[in-house]
Amino acid sequence: GLQGPAETSREKAEDEQNPWEEYRTAAESAKLSVELAAKAAEEARELFARELRVSVIIPSKDNPSVLGKCLRSLTQRPEGSVPVEILLIDNGSNEENRKKTEQLVEEIRTAGTPIRYVYEPAEFNFSTMCNRGAELADGKLLLFLNDDIELCENDWLDKMVSRALQPYVGSVGLKLYYPDSVKIQHDGIVNLPVGPVHKLQFMEDDRSYYFGRNRFTQDCVAVTGACLLIRTEVFREAGGFREVLRVAYNDVELGFRLLEMGYYNVVWNDRFAYHHESLSRGSDESPEKMQRLVQERELLYQMHPQFRGEDPFYPKGLNREGLDSRVVPAYLTDRNVLQEPFWKRGLPGGEELQKIRRDNCLMARVETAGPERIQGYSVIPVSYTHLRAHET
């Protein structure tokens, strides 16, 4: 029946005498807020994984012990790091090594990292294997990684990703050391008259070389495919690796092509990894392999004649005959220090490289002779707009 005024007043008084009711209501609201916050955080993590996932593509064959070191170092990163998926491309390991690789893949998968093992027997072709991995990748970025790379620092990938996401950046590389040392293996590729080389290779990283070349992030003509990060859309826009370059210079050719498309290639120098160089395919020093190397280098320059002996990121006043970066004055060489701009040279018919970026310079480096010596340097302004803007 209907409640009378007395009963209503009594219930109201009982509620007022129960102070825990207010706290219970507040606790339920707080619990709901926590649940909503957790759900929102999970949705944000899923979105982050979808938007920024890096697909790590690793070509490998008959190398499970070294591969294991690579995979474990890759997955030992702190919580909250850029998420990865791994695509392992095997072009024909023997049965014993295939089983070892499958066990390794299961270990990595059980530990929580998505990994896919693609076993497709074929002759070794680095470009084909990388392109195959890129076809299967779901990530917004692609990291091409040799199976003999050992990662050493927690935030190396996050740092590389932050650079690769910049709209004008093509590929991003990492400083590489020889195992258990600070001896440089890769610090960006330089294109010299003898061909593409790793400047500062075999040199100790215990000092700063020319203007901090081994200390700061640098633009370069290309980075090594042993550890190369690139946005998926840019890689596909470029058309992937050229499969006619089966072993060597495929990474350099990609770097040349990215420059021609208007992108920069960058080497990140404040993080490093170890490179147990070429353990998968062996040495390149046999006569047959040296012949192949020469042939692929010539093919590279047939594809990009304007780059033969030219590197827009390497000063002409530095050594162009070896791996060090010492200054070589113009009077000791036959070079012309007043050559026309790089993008106007080398193309048939005299056409310019229209898409190469011609940004204003950020720094003017001027070296002068001291009173005790004459070095014979020439100062060439390369960006009059920038220099005039700072005259005052």
Regions found by a protein language model. Give the residues of each.
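Short aromatic/hydrophobic "clamp" motif used to bind/position activated sugar donors
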Residues: L142
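Acidic donor-binding segment of Leloir-type glycosyltransferases
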Residues: T75-Y119
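A recurrent flexible, glycine/aromatic-enriched loop bordering the glycosyltransferase active site
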Residues: S127-T128, P193-I230
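Glycine-rich, basic loop-to-helix element that forms the pyrophosphate-binding segment
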Residues: E120-A137
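Conserved small/polar residues in nucleotide/adenosyl-binding loops
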Residues: T385-T392
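Conserved donor NDP-sugar-binding/catalytic core segment of glycosyltransferases
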Residues: E153-P193
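Non-catalytic membrane-proximal stalk/linker segments that position and tether the catalytic domains
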Residues: G1-L52, L293-E298, Q306-E367
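A short, conserved alpha-helix in the catalytic core of glycosyltransferases
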Residues: W156-M160, D219-G239, V244-F272
